[in-house]
Every structure is written in C-alpha cells, then in structure tokens.
Amino acid sequence: MKVLWAALVVTLLAGCGADVEPGPEVQPGPEVQLGKEWATWQASQPWEQALGRFWNYLRWVQTLSEKVQEQLLSSQVTEELTALMDDTMKEVKACKSELEEQLGPVTEETKARVSKELQAAQARLGADMEEVRSRLAQYRGELQAMVGQSTEELRGRLSAHLRKLRKRLLRDAEDLQRRLAVYQAGIREGAARSVNTLREHLGPLAEQAATVHTLVSKPLQERAEAWAQRLRGRLEKAGFPVGDRLDEVREQVQEVRAKVEEQANQVRLQAEAFQGRLKSWFEPLVQDMQQKWAELVEKVQLAVGAVPTSVPSEKQ
C-alpha cells in the first residue's frame, strides 16, 4: 500500500500540463494523435482512446483553416464532435460500471462513495466536451451572420476560448484517469492480498481434510480387503457350496455395514466442525477487507480532494 500511495502522490504533483498554442494543421483520422499537451497520456483503455480521438479532432478544428471554416458553416463539425463525445462517454460509463462490479466485498457505503467520486469526475469531463460543442455551434451562428465581413477578430476569440477549454478538458481527463487507476490498483492489490490470506487459511484446512480422509478410508479399505480374503478362502475350501455359509456371510456383511455407518457419522461430525471453523475464519477476513477498502477510498479523497465532487457551473 505504501508503494501505491507514493506513486499516487507523485502523479498528483505532476500537475495537469501547460497550455500550448496550436501547431500546424492536423487532419482527423483513425489514429489518435494527441499532440504535445498529452505527451504523458497513456491511452490504453477504450475510453482513453475514444477521448484521444475527440481531442485530435478538436486540435484540427482549432487550426481554423479554410477547410475547417467551410465545415463550420455547415453542421458537419458539431455533428462529428457529438458522435465522438457520445462514443467517449459510452466507454467511460462502461469502464466505471466494470470497476464497480470488481469492488468485491466492500460495504454499500464504500461502494456509494466510490461511485459518487467517479460519477462527479465523469460529469465534469462530459460538461467540458459539451461546452466545446456549444461554443462551436455559437461560432457557427456568428460566422453565418458575418458573411462577407472580416472574421479575424471572431476567429481570435474562438481560438483563445478553445485553448482554455482544451486545458480544462485535459485537467479533468487526467483527474478521471488518476481516480480510475487508483481504484483499479486497489482492486488488484486487494485481490492479491485476499488470495494470499485464503491460501494461509485454507492450507492447514486442506491438510486436515486430507488427514481425515486417510483416517476414514484406510480402515474401511483394509477391513473390506480382509473380509474378501476370508470369504474367498472359505468358498474355495468348501468347493463353492455356499448355502451352509450364507448365514455367516450375512453376519459379516452386516458387521461391515455397521462399521461403514459409524465411520460415515464420524466424517459428518468432523465436516460440521470444519464448516464452523471455516466460517469463523472468513468472517473476520471479509470485515478486514471492507475496512481496507474504506481506508483506500478516504485516502483517494484526501489525495485528489482539491477537485470538487460536483460539476462546476461557472464557465472558465
């Protein structure tokens, strides 16, 4: 856990990156080309790759080239951004749902706190993308109203606004990425710790079960083999006239049956005792795991608590 939290602190101190002027025109395509702002962005998850495509398209729009200007006059740009935004939020929701399913044996209160944290981060990211789309739709209306006039000042204001929106989008994307990474790391560590604990508890129990099986099965097997040998010898000696031996054989069968029932009853009693010990060992283990998860959530909230849990209404 110490290594996990040390890595988290280093990540948080790294900041969200600088505001960078747009580079040369970048045509949108299937490959995710994030630019210098996202040099440290690791797009390994589907939602991260989808967000990278949104970011790449936004960088191309911000160049405000002649081709971009032509498409802005139509609804093509806003429609494309809408599709990319919907795809991103769909993947974010899927990732969040998968993580919540993997939380395992934690209390409902802890699950609710984790869900609230991720929901707030997800909402901030969605609000950022929605504002980008709304601003471009507004620019489209302003551009159509100024046909035949100079739009240099209008383009300058849009470019400056988009830079601010990109910076906010990057900040909130990294915040969501950090939260997901911390909880996923906690799940992996908790699972590994649980497996080791189970092995420590189940190892002696497995050995005990094997010992009980040996103690029960060996006498029965030896008894059956001895009885079979005696019966075979008597039948051979008698020349197979088994009628006069039937009563004796029946008595021996009943004797073996009684022994089997006695041994089975002993096994049942030992199994019930085994079940009771197993339950008494597992209940503290589950409670300990729930407590560890509650502590993990509190540490995450303290580490990234500088970011509000609700979507800000004030436009930056």
From Swiss-Prot:
Repeat region (Sequence), residues: 83-104, 105-126, 127-148, 149-170, 171-192, 193-214, 215-232, 233-254
Keywords annotated in UniProt: Chylomicron, Endosome, Extracellular matrix, Glycoprotein, HDL, Heparin-binding, Lipid transport, Lipid-binding, Oxidation, Phosphoprotein, Repeat, Secreted, Signal, Transport, VLDL
Compartment(s) where it occurs, according to its Swiss-Prot or TrEMBL record: Secreted; Secreted, Extracellular space; Secreted, Extracellular space, Extracellular matrix; Extracellular vesicle
Post-translational modification: APOE exists as multiple glycosylated and sialylated glycoforms within cells and in plasma. The extent of glycosylation and sialylation are tissue and context specific. Glycated in plasma VLDL.
Signal peptide, first to last residue: 1-18
InterPro entries per UniProt: ApoA_E, Apolipoprotein_A1/A4/E
Residues noted as binding heparin in the record, renumbered to the chain: 165-168, 228-235
Protein name: Apolipoprotein E
Annotated source species: Diceros bicornis minor
